[in-house]
Amino acid sequence: MVNVGPSHAAVAVDASEARKRNISEEVFELRDKKDSTVVIEGEAPVRTFTSSSSNHEREDTYVSKRQVMRDIFAKYLKFIGPGLMVSVAYIDPGNYSTAVDAGASNQFSLLCIILLSNFIAIFLQCLCIKLGSVTGLDLSRACREYLPRWLNWTLYFFAECAVIATDIAEVIGTAIALNILIKVPLPAGVAITVVDVFLIMFTYKPGASSIRFIRIFECFVAVLVVGVCICFAIELAYIPKSTSVKQVFRGFVPSAQMFDHNGIYTAISILGATVMPHSLFLGSALVQPRLLDYDVKHGNYTVSEEQDKVKKSKSTEEIMEEKYFNYRPTNAAIKYCMKYSMVELSITLFTLALFVNCAILVVAGSTLYNSPEADGADLFTIHELLSRNLAPAAGTIFMLALLLSGQSAGVVCTMSGQIVSEGHINWKLQPWQRRLATRCISIIPCLVISICIGREALSKALNASQVVLSIVLPFLVAPLIFFTCKKSIMKTEITVDHTEEDSHNHQNNNDRSAGSVIEQDGSSGMEIENGKDVKIVYMANNWIITVIAIIVWLFLSLLNVYAIVQLGMSHGDIS
């Protein structure tokens, strides 16, 4: 028998501890290696150790991606506003009238026209954003600057007709809502709608207002828009249980039913009510305050003290407006703002505007279709039916939504009229005088109609106004497509100092002829002037967008030809 002494036991323990230390060191060494794993097997269950550096990298990547998404979302929130303002043009009282008529005569089959109109509206509004962002001009000022005088005045005539037709719909719709809700006579209702004129006349001053005030103004309009959406979300809960959801969704697919009961004429009315001409001027103008705010904050655009001294005879408001109208965005501002402006507008139109228009038609189609009241149905009729067949609250909520739409649309239409007159004509008047004269041009026909015609003619006047809007639409879309396709207009300049160039670029620049422009993949060029490079970046439409724009214009024009022929054959009877 061998006796193991204390020294031998100590040696055995030391050897065991050393072995454990070696294993631990190997484990930690393997942990530090990227994407390495180690498995230790013993009496205990198998344990796996994954590289800690890999875990940290994955965690850092996740955190960085999450931070990027937060930054993108925070930046997007800064651009919310113009899309809501433009969306008002697509949920005005004219939409109520045409959608009610479509639902009563064709039930849900014309939902596909609303969807198509929404896509066309988004496409055209993106062109408006592009024009306003690159040139710093709204559509009316671009017409005055780049078109012959006679053509500019012709387009001004069509634009003013569009504003007047829109005002007629807004005023009549608001007057009807006030008449039903609080029993206000129609002429008095028209007079009440003039209040929003003074609200705009004395508050909305794009050149003299800060970006913060403009955002507050946008929030005011946004509250009205959200109120309309809430009303129709509640309204849909009141529709008959027998309404087939499958049949509703089938309406988004073209069918033969859409041609029944003069459906093409109704479709043209929907197109005119959805793709509003005055929204083209509005969309191209609303993008500019954020561009200007970016350039002012980054020191890219200022008015010198010398200029202020020269202009001291002018009022502060006139100086600020002149600064605003002379502004041209820098390339940095365009890159920062344009994409987010397009995304914000597209999301708003494809959610809020599409939902409201479809909801109006679904409510009308589920309550009026195949009913004795369907023939000649108007806003009064649908209120009576909703109140009698569904619930009194249903009719009240519908009229409340109409009132909110009329008020918000009246505000936006006043802004559009101001943009049109100041852009096309460039009146040499005080700003408040221009706004008052602009509104008087539009409000007088509304007063005449509200006083002289009865309830039976109101629906026809509303639908006719939407057909007028559809007819003038191609004339106002044409210059928008022309401007955004022309490289000499859709361009911006970037100035680069030679001293900041490296030797290789400096040598290449010396080989260029002074004053020459060199094309770079058709999108940019370089011009040398006073020892500095002026890089020209072209942002005109590519051939795909150009083809789509031409197809849209031809489609609108063909529909207008059909509408004019139908009016001629029916001797002006649009019933």
Swiss-Prot record:
Main location: membrane
Keyword Transmembrane helix included in the entry's annotation: yes
Gene disruption: observed consequences: Decreased manganese uptake.
Bilayer topology annotation: Multi-pass membrane protein
InterPro entries, per the entry: NRAMP_fam
Covalent link (Glycyl lysine isopeptide (Lys-Gly) (interchain with G-Cter in ubiquitin)) residue numbers: 33-34
Gene Ontology annotations of biological process type: cadmium ion transport; copper ion transport; intracellular copper ion homeostasis; intracellular manganese ion homeostasis; iron ion transmembrane transport; iron ion transport; manganese ion transport
Ranges of the Cytoplasmic topological domain: 92-108, 178-179, 240-266, 366-396, 485-543
Reaction catalyzed: Mn(2+)(in) = Mn(2+)(out)
Phosphoserine PTM positions: 24
UniProt subcellular location: Cell membrane
Region (Disordered): 498-517
Function: High-affinity manganese transporter involved in manganese uptake from the extracellular environment. Also contributes to cellular accumulation of other divalent metal ions such as cadmium, cobalt, copper, iron and nickel.
HAMAP family, per the entry: NRAMP
Name assigned to this protein: Manganese transporter SMF1
